[in-house]
C-alpha cells in the first residue's frame, strides 16, 4: 500500500518517563495535524502513534479533550456516526513532534448506511493491522453496555499485533454514572471479555483516571532506551612466529 509522504516534522529525542504533571503538560501541547478519509491519505510518520477507538457515543472525543485539557480539539458531531475521517493530533513541546494521537471514527451507529459501515470497517481494519508507527490503542467503552460484538471483533483484529508488543487499554468511560458495586462488576466483566487485558475506569466529569491514563500515554510514547550493545572484542592478534632476521 502506498501513501503520500509529506515533509516529516522534527523528531525529539526520547525522554525519561516522569510524573502525571509532566504527562498532562505534554498532552496539553496537542495540535490538529491532519484529517484523512482513507488510510492512503494519512502521512507516514516516524513518531509513536496512539489510536483512540470505540462505538459512537462512547465518549471518545470528550476523553481526548479531557486528557489534552482542550475543549474542542477532538470534534464530537451532534449526529452519531457522522464523523468519517481519521483525525491526527501532534504532541510535543517547543514545536517538536514526538508522538501523535489518532481519533478514529465511532462505529456501530444504526442510522449510518450499510455501505458507509462496510467501508469504515475496511479502513479501520487496514489501519489497525498495517499502520507501521501505531504503538498503542485505547478502546473506549460504555460500562453500562460492556464490550459489544463490534468491540470484540476489533479485539480479534488487534490480537496479533498485541502479541507482537502493541500496547492496549480499555477505558470504561462515563464511570461516574455507576456506584461502587456496579463499577467493580463492570471492571470484572470487561476484563474477562478483554482476555485479561488492562481495563480502567474513566470519567471526564469527575476526572477519574485522567492522571493515570495520561501517564500511560506518556510512557508509551517515551519508552526507555534500550542499552547499547557492547561492541564485540577484537580477537587477540596472534603472536608472530618464526625468527626475525
UniProtKB/Swiss-Prot annotation:
Q: Which InterPro entries match?
A: G_ENGB_dom (IPR030393), GTP-bd (IPR006073), GTP-bd_ribosome_bio_YsxC (IPR019987), P-loop_NTPase (IPR027417)
Task: Provide a GO CC annotation, any one.
Answer: cytosol
Kindly list the biological process annotations in GO that this record carries.
division septum assembly
* Composition-biased stretches (Low complexity): 236-245
> Which cofactors must be present for this protein to function?
Mg(2+)
Single annotated GO MF: GTP binding
For the ligand (GTP), the binding residues are 54-61, 81-85, 103-106, 173-176, 202-204
**In which residues is Mg(2+) bound?**
61, 83
Q: Which UniProt keywords apply?
A: Cell cycle, Cell division, GTP-binding, Magnesium, Metal-binding, Nucleotide-binding, Septation
Q: Where is the composition biased (Basic and acidic residues)?
A: 222-235
Give all residue intervals belonging to the EngB-type G domain: 46-223
Disordered as annotated region, ranges: 219-245
- One short Pfam family name for this protein? MMR_HSR1
NCBIfam families reported for this sequence = GTPase_YsxC (TIGR03598)
The entry assigns this protein to a family as follows: Belongs to the TRAFAC class TrmE-Era-EngA-EngB-Septin-like GTPase superfamily. EngB GTPase family.
Please describe what this protein does.
Necessary for normal cell division and for the maintenance of normal septation.
Q: What is this protein called?
A: Probable GTP-binding protein EngB
Task: Write down the species.
Answer: Polaromonas sp. (strain JS666 / ATCC BAA-500)
Amino acid at each position: 500500500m502506498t501513501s503520500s509522504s509529506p515533509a516529516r516534522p522534527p523528531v525529539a529525542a526520547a525522554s525519561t518517563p516522569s510524573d502525571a504533571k509532566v504527562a498532562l503538560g505534554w498532552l496539553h501541547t496537542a495540535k490538529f495535524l491532519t484529517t484523512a478519509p482513507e488510510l492512503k491519505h494519512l502521512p507516514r510518520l516516524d513518531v509513536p502513534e496512539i489510536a483512540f477507538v470505540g462505538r459512537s457515543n462512547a465518549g471518545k472525543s470528550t476523553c481526548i479533550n479531557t486528557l489534552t485539557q482542550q475543549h474542542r480539539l477532538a470534534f464530537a458531531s451532534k449526529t452519531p456516526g457522522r464523523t468519517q475521517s481519521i483525525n491526527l493530533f501532534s504532541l510535543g513541546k517547543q514545536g517538536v513532534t514526538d508522538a501523535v494521537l489518532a481519533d478514529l471514527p465511532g462505529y456501530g451507529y444504526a442510522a449510518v448506511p450499510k455501505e458507509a459501515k462496510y467501508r469504515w470497517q475496511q479502513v479501520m481494519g487496514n489501519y489497525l493491522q498495517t499502520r507501521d508507527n501505531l504503538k498503542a490503542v485505547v478502546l473506549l467503552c460504555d460500562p453500562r453496555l460492556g464490550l459489544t460484538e463490534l468491540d470484540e471483533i476489533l479485539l480479534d483484529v488487534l490480537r496479533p499485533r498485541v502479541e507482537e508488543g502493541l500496547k492496549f487499554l480499555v477505558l470504561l468511560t462515563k464511570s461516574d454514572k455507576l456506584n461502587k458495586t456496579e463499577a467493580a462488576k463492570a471492571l470484572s466483566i470487561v476484563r474477562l471479555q478483554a482476555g485479561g487485558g488492562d481495563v480502567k475506569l474513566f470519567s471526564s466529569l469527575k476526572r477519574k483516571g485522567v492522571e493515570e491514563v495520561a501517564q500511560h500515554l506518556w510512557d508509551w510514547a517515551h519508552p526507555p532506551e534500550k542499552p547499547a550493545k557492547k561492541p564485540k572484542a577484537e580477537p587477540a592478534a596472534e603472536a608472530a612466529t618464526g625468527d626475525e632476521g
